Amino acid sequence: MFSFVDSRTLVLFAATQVILLAVVRCQDEEDVLATGSCVQHGQRYSDKDVWKPEPCQICVCDTGNVLCDEIICEDPKDCPNAEIPFGECCPICPTEQSSTSSGQGVLKGQKGEPGDIKDVVGPKGPPGPQGPSGEQGPRGDRGDKGEKGAPGPRGRDGEPGTPGNPGPVGPPGPPGPPGLGGNFAAQMTGGFDEKAGGAQMGVMQGPMGPMGPRGPPGPTGAPGPQGFQGNPGEPGEPGAGGPMGPRGPPGPAGKPGDDGEAGKPGKSGERGPPGPQGARGFPGTPGLPGVKGHRGYPGLDGSKGEAGAAGAKGEGGATGEAGSPGPMGPRGLPGERGRPGASGAAGARGNDGLPGPAGPPGPVGPAGAPGFPGAPGSKGEAGPTGARGPEGAQGPRGESGTPGSPGPAGASGNPGTDGIPGAKGSSGAPGIAGAPGFPGPRGPPGPQGATGPLGPKGQTGDPGVAGFKGEHGPKGEIGSAGPQGAPGPAGEEGKRGARGEPGAAGPLGPPGERGAPGNRGFPGQDGLAGPKGAPGERGVPGLGGPKGANGDPGRPGEPGLPGARGLTGRPGDAGPQGKVGPSGASGEDGRPGPPGPQGARGQPGVMGFPGPKGANGEPGKAGEKGLLGAPGLRGLPGKDGETGAQGPNGPAGPAGERGEQGPPGPSGFQGLPGPPGSPGEGGKPGDQGVPGEAGAPGLVGPRGERGFPGERGSSGPQGLQGPRGLPGTPGTDGPKGATGPSGPNGAQGPPGLQGMPGERGAAGISGPKGDRGDTGEKGPEGAPGKDGSRGLTGPIGPPGPSGPNGEKGESGPSGPAGIVGARGAPGDRGETGPPGPAGFAGPPGADGQAGLKGDQGESGQKGDAGAPGPQGPSGAPGPQGPTGVNGPKGARGAQGPPGATGFPGAAGRVGPPGPNGNPGPSGAPGSAGKEGPKGARGDAGPTGRAGDPGLQGPAGVPGEKGESGEDGPSGPDGPPGPQGLSGQRGIVGLPGQRGERGFPGLPGPSGEPGKQGGPGSAGDRGPPGPVGPPGLTGPAGEPGREGNAGSDGPPGRDGATGIKGDRGETGPLGAPGAPGAPGAPGPVGPTGKQGDRGESGPQGPLGPSGPAGARGLPGPQGPRGDKGEAGEAGERGQKGHRGFTGLQGLPGPPGTAGDQGASGPAGPGGPRGPPGPVGPSGKDGSNGLPGPIGPPGPRGRGGETGPAGPPGQPGPPGPPGPPGPGIDMSAFAGLSQPEKGPDPMRYMRADQASSSVPQRDVDVEATLKSLNNQIESIRSPDGTKKNPARTCRDLKLCHPEWKSGDYWIDPNQGCTVDAIKVFCNMETGETCVYPNPSKIPKKNWWSAKGKEKKHIWFGETINGGFQFSYGDDSSAPNTANIQMTFLRLLSTDATQNITYHCKNSIAFMDEASGNLKKAVLLQGSNDVEIRAEGNSRFTYNALEDGCKKHTGKWSKTVIEYRTQKTSRLPIVDIAPMDIGGADQEFGVDIGPVCFL
């Protein structure tokens, strides 16, 4: 791909990236940008910028200073009817000729209409000196259309046009009188300013108005007003302009030279003095068709045009003679299906289908190929004579003449008379596609197509960046009080701001409506005792006594119902940026916006298929009768002489017989469109010609021209103009849409874009004989020769020598449309040509099918700040609100009312295209704008990158106040404004509707659970307290549903003229202009047409078949064949490129249940349970095996004397011996086998101490028991401080019979020192952590200063308040928080109760209004706000609600919040709203937070 990109394109691309980066960097560093720039009326100007804020004032920005000067006008002398052109300062005399040509004396007027100069063409002047660059002027007010002025001064040389067809030779005329030009001050004094962009002429190009009929030449315009003294330009080298000589005779055609290599660009020449207006240059030869460009981006929808009245269908004219190819007809309906033809060659690429779903933006593609030639631009100056073109291709082979040696080409014969059209031949087989021909002449535009249905609505774009803050408008008068509006929903409360200074008293509001009767007052005091009367007789009961004195006044009654709403204060200054609220749900589709401005021209659409044969055209007008030439005698043929020099053209001879059709000559340059010819007389239809032989496939042609623009889409809603996104990759081809119905015939438009030749139209009525036309298509067959045997195809012959130039025939009448040529193969990419002029917008394309609505995309990253958008019109002055003093900076505020409408921000970056929405209803057509002044023609440049955003325009003049419109729909929530000045305390408003449930509040610390109080009896309604001060602004609530659209307000007056904008897009197609003056003589034309066919020679003998010739050049395009039969299925194509990722599919149906998975690996061992209860004693065990023999015991005491032994053998009696020694037990120490003899120690055991062995057994048993208990306590902890459990759930599992109570847990395990004491609910297994402290004392905590009520955070805002904490005082700080972090991880549910004790304070439901607007907010431990209403995940419930109204008695509301997001609990803060009055008190019991 890289090899195809011209290196210059890369350099240009790199440069644009650098510039773009620089621009972005400058936007980020506004202080750098501002150095040297100036600001006037809110508009920023760059250094050295020049502008005219008023017609008679001109200003310049000089390194940060604005220097303005008044324009001093000279009185026009001897001018009774001096005029001041619209938007100008000084009067001009319409008839006075300007005598200055230097540009320094008098400013030139606007460019006049072209003068009617019949035969005058002045000589081209030498180039003038280069002037310094001028500054871009502001856009002037639109002037009234002046009378037609004399020709303006010569403009700057335009780009050389591509050579047109040679025009007829006009006699050289004298130069025309110099006319008064437009305001060329910037041009004359400074040339072009590099910064001025496309608006270098100081005139904004408006849309092209309809061209009127050519008027008579106007009187010469008066000299323009005095211009500023320009800096003198460097002196140019004046060339002596000689007069133009008469045209010389055409020289003989030279051989075409080889193309030279492109030279390096020369240095810019110095600017010459302006020459007289040059003649219009010829249109250049259309380039060969290029390769099809990438699919263009869809243009913005244009505004809907008014449907023209349907024209009456004319009567069909008689069939005329086949003319030269006509303009392309409108696309017709598809014909009936033809018989299947033989398999044809590969066809041209088909139309692109309907747009596929939008893909993500692709990378920036390479520069596209040049587009088709646009519609004719305004008249350019004559370009330099182009180089001689190469010789044309060889024509088709002529019929065999009498054999002979070819003689040199003779001079052109006199024109012959037209032959009778031959009968239509039968259709030949389709030939192989020839090489692409030059594009045919531009056809007239087709009738206005039917407006397509409104396109689907796109997704909402990213919000634009906020614009610069506008200047403060003038202070408006205080408006009359509006009608009382319905009470708005109460905003959510913000956090408390610092206390503000008291504001000045505002004006008294209108009296409120009569309040409801107050409660009955207390009885008055007893009156004084009357004097005691004398006792009388008991009388009859007397009449009632006199009325007693009035008692003391009772307590004041409750305030009455709210009075009417006071005047709206003016919006406060913008507050700090609030926290971003959650994304609201998508609103309903808004009404269609007004038509957007005309978008940039889209890239051309693909060329449509040729339409069917058009209807017969109306007969043309009769052409002027030509002069009869003197009849020449036909001479006998002489011998072939050598070619003589070109003689002068002889007089026209008499009409000869119609010669045989010569081969087509080389293509001439495209001529200017001729005037419509007179209608021809009806000719017979010509026979279809014999199809030519199939030509060899042509070489790959050069890249084709840009395709026709697609049809104009209907007007879409006005979008914010974003910077141009990267081009997306082309979507896949969709199915071909059905052809729409033909619209009514529109008025004749100017020549449309270059079309491919259409099919041959029906012949028109034959007109009177015109002058000789261009070479026609091949005529009927000549005198029949004998059929020769068909020779083999010969080789391509070399190009023949150029023939002598023939006389240029007059333009013939336009013939019917020619046939459509086959599409050529794409050629190699040509070098980048000069930018063509901008084409007109094409007709609208067919609407794409509506795409599925895509899922809501994730929010994109915030884009770079766009440049400020254009200044919107100032709104009507609002009523003046009372001025208060600034309040202290508040904490988080509630959602403010919608702010005043800001100026539109600049467009943000374009997001990826959303899927098409459903079509919206048609918008009302906008009113027609005023006709703008005709802009000077700019040179068409290549498609530039998206321009940098323009500077912000100055604020418009405030319009008159319009009538009040109906209430509009609620605007989107604006960013919260800053705290406004406190107003005077207003009348209590009606209760608002129940608001949406808010976000969860911050978690508060929990307290010990209070005992459940019995419900108190409802007290009487107490008097309302004074209104509290404004609370802090709460976070933005969820967006409300979109209101109904209000009716449109009356249109405001036109604003003041804005500053001149950047160059506008090319306007819509104007009406056809008057024909221009004849052009200057063109360069020497190429070879002339072939002379008349000679008479048939005598029939020669049939020659032998020649050898096979090389393949001939492709023949001319044959007539369109019948539709072929469907071809055989082609071979399977190569695999296409990978498609783009499709849209997210809908979720599939649930799948079937999977097979049972394999058993997972065994989990890790659970924590050791608590020790079990001591079991009952076991049964006695059986005797164990005997142990080993123990060590020898201590020496025993001496034994008792043993019993006397049996009598011994009688011996000699001796004396008794002494006691024997003790037994040495060491002798038995080694014995361990008792079976070998009796246990030697068995007699000793009874002697040992009885306590030694049992004591040892007890110690071992105790140790074992202790170890067993420890192991059991690890396996089954008992919830003591020494042996804490991990959670209460573990305790419940190990000891299900235990009762609820306080236990110790250690969720993070490890050392037990940081265990915490909690309440275990053994019914549920919940672990409940106590708050510390667990109560907020009951008292009046807050005294409000203002009348607005807001939520006041207890721990963050209230003096003496605190955030709730949890755990035991005895633990180290943060211990409970750490353990709760682990506890949250071990739990899936959390719950907490808060009891709000109230006295004249609403906690949840406001019984008076029936809504939850005054409900308290809670703050969770992860800073989320928990509310009474709104998103169900962040809302709490009220288990008991005794704080519904003000009764003057203490009551309570029990709030419960349950969640599976354990990170939201515990509650750490509470924010009541209904507090601040002297009689409003509250207290809070914080319940424990429980995890399960």
From Swiss-Prot:
SMART domains assigned to the protein according to its UniProt record, in alphabetical order: COLFI (SM00038), VWC (SM00214)
Domain Fibrillar collagen NC1: 1258-1492
Biased amino acid composition, Gly residues: 236-245, 311-320, 539-548, 1010-1019
Keyword Nucleotide-binding on entry: no
N-terminal signal peptide: 1-26
Any one GO molecular-function label of the UniProt entry: extracellular matrix structural constituent
Matches recorded under SUPFAM superfamilies: FnI-like domain
UniProt cross-references to InterPro entries, sorted A to Z: Collagen (IPR008160), Collagen_superfamily (IPR050149), Fib_collagen_C (IPR000885), VWF_dom (IPR001007)
Entry keywords, A to Z: Calcium, Collagen, Disulfide bond, Extracellular matrix, Glycoprotein, Hydroxylation, Metal-binding, Repeat, Secreted, Signal
Biased composition, class Low complexity, residue ranges: 197-208, 223-234, 321-333, 340-355, 366-376, 396-436, 480-490, 501-517, 627-636, 645-655, 711-741, 838-850, 894-910, 919-930, 1105-1114, 1140-1159, 1176-1186
Role noted for this protein: Type II collagen is specific for cartilaginous tissues. It is essential for the normal embryonic development of the skeleton, for linear growth and for the ability of cartilage to resist compressive forces.
Record-given protein name: Collagen alpha-1(II) chain
Organism the protein comes from: Xenopus tropicalis (Western clawed frog)
Gene that this sequence comes from: col2a1
